[in-house]
Amino acid sequence: MKKILVIALAVVMMVSALALVACGPQEKVAYGIVHKSYVGKGTVVVAGGKISSASIDEACLPTYVVASEASADTVTATVLDHGAEVQKHFYKTVKFADITLEYDLTDGYKSGSTKLMDLLKEEANCEKWFEAVASDSVSVMIAGKEDKTIMTSAKLLKSKNGYWGTPAENALGWKANMEATCAYVVANGFAAESFEQVAGEGKLDNEKVDNLGVHTGATWTDMLDYYNVLKAAFNK
């Protein structure tokens, strides 16, 4: 009889512990392409079905860091940069996680026959790139050796590299937009139907959102991308 009571008590304690874990704060993370050609990481902390905090960061792609001059380890290409044709020296070979990229004059960075942007359609590959950047694990091949001092988190993470640090008139800049977006999600979750309807159009800026009575406080034109990566994290 005592043995049965001990077993029953152990089961009750285990169930209670599992219930406490389930009710406690959970950090959820999702990755995806944002702002057309960046990898975003959305993180939410959920407790009791509600969001207690949210954060966003972005990693630039390997094209963001180029060499100052041509060498045996670079490929020189003419590309469009903010509407103007410019010549850039891209690093020929870049490695991260289990993926090796080679720069192609026609398709840009590729892994085998797969273009980088097609590779990043899979969340797992977005995670590999983002976390490699964040941990300073991206290698650039220089003179046959792996160099991890070129494509660093300081150069590629928007939270560190000063991206859009000086906003234009009536804009917030990267950091303030990120904070406004996260504050909106924490306050409102993902149930605002009028916001969803506008988001479905595929383009969303603060003026359009305000016109429908949903004020996010953000001013970036790709609000939908950041909203969706946070939503994907919440739904995991």
Describe each PLM feature range.
Residues M1-V11:
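Positively charged n-region of N-terminal signal peptides that target proteins for export
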Residues V6, S16, A218-T219:
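A broadly tuned, weak detector of single residues within folded domains
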Residues V15-V29:
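Sec-dependent signal peptide cleavage junction
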Residues E27, G32-K236:
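Active-site- and interface-proximal helix/loop "cap" or "latch" segments in soluble metabolic
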